[in-house]
Amino acid sequence: MASSINNSSQPTVPSISNNSHGDSFVNEGPPSNFKNNSLTSSTHSSTDHVNVLPISQDKEMDISSPVKKQKASYSNKSPNKAPIQKSRGSSLKSHLETESQQTPVKRRRRKATIRNVDYCSACGGRGLFICCEGCPCSFHLSCLEPPLTPENIPEGSWFCVTCSIKSHHPPKHPLSIWSQLYDWIDSQNPSQYRLPDDLVHYFHGISRGDTGAYKETEGEMDTDEFSALPTGSSITNLAYCGYCSKPSMGACWVYGCQLCDTFYHKNCKEHAKKCSHDSIGKKGMRVPKNAVVIRTPLVLDTTSNTLNPKVMISGWQFLMGEFPSDELLYFPRLPVSCLYKVSEDGLIKDFLYAIGIEAKKFNNERKKRELEVIPPDVKSALLPARTHPNLPIALRTLFNKART
């Protein structure tokens, strides 16, 4: 019995034949979508067109499985569609597009307009200013170094000393101990002398405004919160009497001992012997230690009617002028246990006095050094003239020392 395909009216189906080695192979027929094929087993007749399909006995054909097709013919894929391969350029482009979507675009911002202050950055006053183009500073023409006049104002943009140093970088001073200090001084704008902030804000009742001017801050203090009390000011540094343990009350002031940290009221001064200092009666009392005292040079007490008119008093006491002269020597009068104000005249005189002392010391040392480098023959010629009336006293003294 042989297997046959009855397909008289339809095209032939693929036939399976064996080669010389006994392997079967497929002869492709019509397309795979061809329908109405019947596969039967019957005795062949001479009238039908029969294609005999010899099947190897050792290899049976699985009729239920579909016929395998070659890869090169009748592919299910469209022949016009080739596999898409991404080039390197396209992958790089897609990568850049993805990265640009994740990273925000940086836009160039316009430079903000600088708004200069409406007061002089050197003295804090008002008036006609010249404004810096690189910072908010403004200056009076007379406050600059060197000063300017309305006739020689530079044309175009003007920059202060600090901005000019940052942009131009001038040569620095030779390396020395003070070179960094000199460089810092050269890079600073001119500024008026101001008291340190610790000293300005220490005294209760006064402060300094934005322009540098002093202002009074008197008013009722809110004591509901502990933070309302200024811990670093003079109002919390009270001096208490060593006898009655009370601070200054009205006209009863507190004074401190010069040899220890004990304080007494004026009415309790007879109890000052508790300090056990023998010289307490001679040196009197002093200002409380907790109060800040500006030390100025001692001057003669010309206003005192005491037997010893050459008693030296402090310049701070001398400048307090509002108190009677009999209390200047022993009991400098204070409204409370702390100082509220610092005399401006006392600061100026103290500063000038310190400069004068340093200048005298410097001049004496300079003259002494100049005398030391004089050759011996020249010095011997100058020595006979040491008693000349026009020769300064300092040089006369130096000549005497050199002679000896």
UniProtKB/Swiss-Prot annotation:
Keywords: Metal-binding, Phosphoprotein, Zinc, Zinc-finger. One of its GO terms (biological process) is regulation of transcription by RNA polymerase II. Residues 1-22, 87-104 have a biased composition (Polar residues). This is Uncharacterized protein C16C9.05. The modification Phosphothreonine is found at T47. The lineage of its organism: Eukaryota, Fungi, Dikarya, Ascomycota, Taphrinomycotina. The keyword Phosphoprotein applies. Residues 1-110 are annotated as: Disordered. Pfam families: PHD. GO terms for molecular function: zinc ion binding. GO terms for cellular component: cytosol; nucleus; Rpd3S complex. Signal peptide: none annotated. A zinc finger (PHD-type) spans 117-166.
